[in-house]
Structure formats: structure tokens, C-alpha cells
């Protein structure tokens, strides 16, 4: 029997695996290829349209310790999860999946401290979610029995296992804090009735995804002021007011009574593209349906002129040229802020986004 895996990072990775929304595999494949090249990896991308995941296979094995710290799930815009993978187990027997998975884990020569079973976000794969819940405890016990798992041990990586179908398992690893906050990169957020619209969940996800804890604590506190452009019926406005900010909601349309009942909101009937505040505010948020370059120009102008310290905004993307549209907006913002100083610009295709991405922009001095 092979020796018990050690309490160190002795794992060797075979490539990278990214989860995404079905239909966005092409964008993730392009991003993953560029990312791999940027960190010195050579290999090739594999994907299948509609599969909701993409893999990169390296020509040569890579030390996990060298790769793991670079694999922050926020790095790729269109990926919900980004993980180094070290083994693929095929032809899993229906009556005993634990043994071959545990054997492959032990053979990798690494002990793990946390276990997470995931599936791609497709109708076919999600049928296995019940199996994953039932299988987690028995698999963990088997891993513990062979010495490949020590729950909660400090300094050890997490073990993520992806089941794209009933007979295949991709074995992946992540350092604590490097993988997505939620299994499959899908947040479990509760929709409150008074929030006016489900769009409030998009802003809630953006706040947790695009901002650090330090940034959240500094910028989302009672007494600060925010502006919501194109606010009606008030999903984003409610999210800010619920956190204690006083919000100016700019929209010619009506606001939901539940939002106005917070007594934290002033409704201004005006055009979101032309209205400007009399004094600078902490936040401007914008979820208007408009050409992405027009939104990018708007948010860049608010930051460049000091009307707000930071902004979260949504860019509606064309279906056939998503990456090109993102880079066009990035270039536009960069040019507008050339004289304003260093800035933070982050994009992410959130779970609550569809044909769109959400961005965060702030001058570097305001980023913390």
C-alpha cells in the first residue's frame, strides 16, 4: 500500500479547469488559453459547447505549489470557478465510485483538509446534485481511512471533485481562499419580498465578488451616499438602502413602494445619462439597458470628474463578440482615466448575469 500522503504541498497538477454558464465556453477557452500562456504554461484547451466547463491540459506536469497562488477564481471574467486539476477518473462503477476516486487521490501524494463535490451548471449535470450531497460523507470517510484527508487541518489544500456525468470525475485542488466562495461558483442568496426586483441579487453578488472585505467595510456603511442611475423599480437602490446608505434614485419611471418605504431614498425623475449630483457621492451604480460603450463612457466620466469615488455597473454584451466588447470598454475607460491616476477596474460574469457582465471601477486611492 502506498504511504500516507504528507502534510505538505507535494501535489503535481496536470492543468486547469474552469466552470462557466453554458454557452460561454468559447469566451472562457480564450481567456484560459491567454491566462495559461501568461503564467508560462504550454498546453491546449478542451471544451464542448453547452458543457459549462473548460479544461486546459499542460504538456508537462506542473508543481501545484507554483500554480495554486496564481489561480484566483476572480482572474477570468467569464469563469465562475478556476482550479488546478491533477487527475481524471473515467468509467466509475455505479456501485463503488469511492474506491477509484480515493485511490487516485492517494496516488497524487497529497493530503487534503476540505472536500467539495460539484457539477457543471447544466440540466444534465445538475441531476447529480442529490448524488453529490449523499456521496460527500462516505467519500470523506474513505479518504480519511487511507490517510488522504484530515478535516480542517491548516496549510492543506481543498479537494474539489467535478462530476460532469455519472461515470467521470475531475479531481482538482485549491488553496484556501483561492476557489470561488460558493460551490460551482453559484451564490446562495435569498430574495426578500421588499427588494422590488430580482436584480437586487445581482448587486448583492457583485458586492461579494468584486469587492474585498476591506472595501466592503469601508464603502458600504451607514451615512454614506449613493446614486442609482436607471433605478426603477428599485432592486439596486433597495440593496444599498438596506445596507444603510442614503440613495438618490434617478429614473423617469416609478419606484416600488417598498423601496420608498425605507425612507432612505430620494426619487429624482430625470435622465440617468445627463443628471449629475451637486456634491460627490461614495457610490454610483448603474444597470441601464444601453450600448456597453455608452455605459463605459458614463461611469468613466463620473470617476474622472470626482462625482463618485467608486461605481458598480452592468454592461450588456453582443452575443457574437463578447470578449471584443469587453476589451473595447476597457480601452475606453483606460483612455478616459489616463490623467486621473491609477485605478481599479474589475469585470465578472456573475451567476445573476446573462448576456452581460458586471464591473467595478474606482481610483486606486479610493479602492480601500
Swiss-Prot record:
Keyword annotations of the record: Cytoplasm, Methyltransferase, rRNA processing, S-adenosyl-L-methionine, Transferase
GO CC term, one of those recorded: cytoplasm
Enzyme class: transferase
Record has GTP-binding as a keyword: no
GO molecular function annotations of the record: S-adenosylmethionine-dependent methyltransferase activity
Residues reported to bind S-adenosyl-L-methionine: 199, 232-235, 251, 271, 287
UniProt cross-references to InterPro entries, sorted A to Z: RlmM_FDX, RlmM_THUMP-like, RNA_MeTrfase_FtsJ_dom, rRNA_MeTrfase_M, SAM-dependent_MTases_sf
Protein's recorded name: Ribosomal RNA large subunit methyltransferase M
Amino acid at each position: 500500500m502506498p504511504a500516507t500522503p504528507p502534510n505538505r504541498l507535494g501535489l503535481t497538477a496536470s492543468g486547469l479547469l474552469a466552470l462557466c454558464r453554458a454557452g460561454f465556453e468559447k469566451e472562457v477557452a480564450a481567456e484560459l488559453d491567454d491566462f495559461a500562456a501568461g503564467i508560462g504554461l504550454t498546453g491546449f484547451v478542451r471544451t464542448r459547447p453547452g458543457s459549462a466547463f473548460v479544461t486546459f491540459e499542460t504538456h508537462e506536469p506542473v508543481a501545484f505549489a507554483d500554480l495554486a497562488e496564481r489561480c484566483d477564481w476572480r482572474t477570468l471574467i467569464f469563469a465562475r470557478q478556476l482550479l488546478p486539476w491533477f487527475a481524471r477518473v473515467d468509467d466509475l462503477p455505479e456501485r463503488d465510485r469511492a474506491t477509484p476516486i480515493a485511490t487516485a487521490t492517494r496516488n497524487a501524494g497529497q493530503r487534503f483538509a476540505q472536500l467539495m463535490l460539484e457539477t457543471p451548471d447544466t440540466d444534465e449535470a445538475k441531476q447529480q446534485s442529490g448524488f453529490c450531497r449523499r456521496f460527500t460523507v462516505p467519500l470523506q470517510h474513505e479518504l480519511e481511512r487511507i490517510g488522504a484527508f484530515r478535516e480542517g487541518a491548516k496549510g492543506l489544500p481543498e479537494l474539489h471533485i467535478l462530476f460532469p456525468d455519472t461515470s467521470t470525475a475531475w479531481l482538482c485542488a485549491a488553496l484556501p481562499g483561492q476557489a470561488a466562495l460558493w460551490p460551482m461558483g453559484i451564490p446562495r442568496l435569498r430574495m426578500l419580498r421588499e427588494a422590488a426586483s430580482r436584480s437586487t441579487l445581482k448587486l448583492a453578488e457583485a458586492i461579494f465578488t468584486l469587492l474585498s472585505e476591506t472595501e466592503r467595510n469601508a464603502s458600504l456603511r451607514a451615512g454614506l451616499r449613493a446614486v442609482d442611475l436607471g433605478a426603477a423599480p428599485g432592486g439596486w437602490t433597495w440593496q444599498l438602502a438596506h445596507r444603510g446608505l442614503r440613495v438618490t434614485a434617478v429614473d423617469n419611471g416609478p419606484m416600488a413602494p417598498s423601496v420608498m418605504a425605507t425612507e432612505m431614498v430620494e426619487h429624482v425623475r430625470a435622465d440617468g445619462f445627463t443628471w449629475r449630483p451637486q456634491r460627490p457621492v461614495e457610490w454610483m451604480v448603474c444597470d441601464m439597458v444601453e450600448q456597453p460603450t455608452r455605459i463605459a463612457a458614463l461611469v468613466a466620466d463620473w470617476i474622472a470628474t470626482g462625482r463618485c469615488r467608486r461605481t458598480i455597473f452592468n454592461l450588456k454584451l453582443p452575443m457574437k463578440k463578447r470578449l471584443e466588447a469587453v476589451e473595447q470598454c476597457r480601452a475606453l475607460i483606460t483612455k478616459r482615466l489616463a490623467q486621473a491616476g491609477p485605478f481599479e477596474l474589475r469585470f465578472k460574469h456573475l451567476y445573476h448575469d446573462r448576456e452581460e457582465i458586471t464591473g467595478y471601477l474606482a481610483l486606486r486611492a479610493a479602492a480601500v
